[in-house]
Amino acid sequence: MNRAVQTRLRGERGSVLISGMLLTLALLMVLGAAVDIGHAFIVRRDLSSLADGAALAGAQQLDQQAIHQGQLALDPQQAQAAALSALSGAPGIQAHAEATPEQVHVQVTRRFPTILLRLVGLADLTVSAQANAAPRAP
């Protein structure tokens, strides 16, 4: 009986190595996803700050004729230009701004390369953020 057990165990030699390698690969994939998704959250936070700043810059462009008539309204063309100008120094982003007399809407998008998810075929991620701002009386 002892000899039968030894013969059986010799046939399974190295099976733990394969299981260990598969477990290590799975852990690396989870770690890669965590690193890249964490990076995506940081990029989104930065984009959100940029969009907020650009929308606020646009919301400061008031229509002077409307002010003289006692109304608080934006000059849409100047508001859109100011919002896009506020984003002009930010590298690697795509920006879109729309303005009406009531508000400014800004959307920014950035594509960035992944670090470890590239190993499973996901070479880059796209993250976007948007913000709205409207003028208010003090």
Descriptions of predicted regions:
Residues 32-34, 83-84, 120-121:
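Intrinsically disordered, low-complexity segments enriched in polar/charged residues with Gly/Pro
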Residues 1-77:
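Alpha-helical assembly-interface signal, strongest on the long, hydrophobic N-terminal helix that forms
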Residues 2-3, 115-138:
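Low-complexity, S/T/G/P-rich flexible repeat/linker segments used as non-globular hinges
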Residues 28, 89-101, 123-134:
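Short, surface-exposed, charge-dense and proline/glycine-enriched linear segments
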Residues 20-21, 45-46, 78, 116, ...:
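Solvent-exposed, flexible loop/coil residues
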Residues 55-108:
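Short amphipathic secondary-structure patches
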